[in-house]
Amino acid sequence: MAIHITGAPCCWGVDDVKNPYLPKWQTVLEEAGKAGFRAIELGPYGYLPLDIDLVSAELSKNGISIVAGTIFDDLVAAGNCENLLRQVDDICDIITKLPPLPREEGQRRRTPYLTVMDWGHDERDYAAGHSDRAPRLSDEDWGRMMEHIRAIAEKAAKWGVRAVIHPHAGGYIEFADEIDRLAEDIPDEVAGLCLDTGHLRYSGMDPVEWLRKYADRLDYIHFKDINEKVYNEVLAEHIRFFEGCGKGAMCPIGTGM
């Protein structure tokens, strides 16, 4: 089976949509097309507009398709479920109306995917990469997060979209014990996995080992690299995950660990 490399707005530093210094979304699509990418992620909720005609025209102009949408939000809080499900509908509504990528022989699920990440907890953000000191969820809170993930995946499936769970440094699904528990609690028929080589390494795991371990659950992979010198310096500080990235902990692929 062929493996295709696509892009994501995070390669342009697009993380928090409230950041006033983000590049224009049109610039990202234009530069992605010039770089030779044939597909890109939608980016964080609210970065690309939800105007299907506008986005479709810009994608077509640059020869790009959308490979995935993203939910990057608090998956734990009891009061956030309605917001999460609204995002599912908004994202799936646009990505299912855009031209799809062709399905490869042997591909487990067709694109576009809905990448789902937990985020928004200071106590875990400052403990990113530190499994020994990062607080874990109570069984009750973990169970609620799993309920939210199942609800997200089920709603996405009604749109014909496959949800894939992305363990993320600084969230409550980051470390080895949490990934294993997630894989046990959320079966493959409900949602797939999107493992990220940079986040795995940042969180103390061997990416190759974990990609092999969950090869039969993987629908999608994120490739990143880590600057070992900066990474070690960042871990020695009391610092948020994206502050560490801002210092250069994540680096161009092939130049790091």
Please name every model-derived segment.
Residues 1-6:
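Extreme N-terminal starter segment of soluble prokaryotic enzymes
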Residues 10-24, 76-85, 134-143, 254-255:
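Active-site mouth loops of central-metabolism enzymes
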Residues 11-13, 44-48, 72-75, 118-122, ...:
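Active-site-proximal loop/turn and secondary-structure-junction residues that shape catalytic pockets
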Residues 19-23, 123-130, 231-243:
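Short, flexible, mixed-charge acidic loops at enzyme active sites
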Residues 24-48, 98:
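Catalytic domains of carbohydrate-active enzymes, especially glycoside hydrolases
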Residues 39-40, 142-252:
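Acidic/histidine-rich catalytic cores of soluble enzymes
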Residues 48-70:
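Aromatic-lined substrate-binding rim segments of carbohydrate-active enzymes
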Residues 61, 65, 80-193:
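Active-site acidic/histidine proton-transfer and metal-coordination neighborhood
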